[in-house]
Amino acid sequence: MSDSIVILGAARTPMGGFQGDFSALAAHDLGGAAIKAAVERSGVSPDLVGEVLFGNCLMAGQGQAPARQAAFKGGLPQSAGAVTLSKMCGSGMKAAMFAHDMLLAGSHDVVVAGGMESMTNAPYLMLKGRGGYRMGHDRIYDHMMLDGLEDAYEAGRSMGTFGEDCAAKYNFTR
């Protein structure tokens, strides 16, 4: 491969507040807006995009293949592949790393990578709903907490505490 791997365009949506101005927009709506803007800024024809890699962790209730939905909403053609990645806070970065690898391997010449999320639109979950509740009380789970903000291995521990622990251990500053 003789060409350098470069970032040609970048875009993001403004930071939204929980249940704020972007409440009516699903993650794939926000991702689609970012894709559209990044591709326009790049000057590359949307028809040249070979693959879309987009991180999204809170997928419940969005429908199948959120990255594919975002790609279509971003004006990309059906010929572009799309993969949704779920690696918690690192999903968008991992998407960019995979994009680099695809470009380096020559799998594609143009790849769109990023991440999208809407905590506001994360639904509540009834984990026993499929099999049926028989008698008595049970729980409804907050998808945002269960699959996003609480550690899966240490029940009830907020993911933010890991960042605080790393900051203290390695003397990171804001």
Regions of interest found by a model, annotated:
Residues 1-80, 118-174:
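Conserved "HGTGT" condensation-loop signature of ketosynthase/thiolase-family condensing enzymes
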Residues 51-53, 84, 111:
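Short, conserved beta-strand segments within well-ordered enzyme catalytic domains
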Residues 79-89:
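Short pre-catalytic strand/loop immediately N-terminal to key active-site residues, enriched for Gly-Thr
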Residues 87-117, 159-161, 167-174:
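Active-site-proximal alpha-helical scaffold in enzymes
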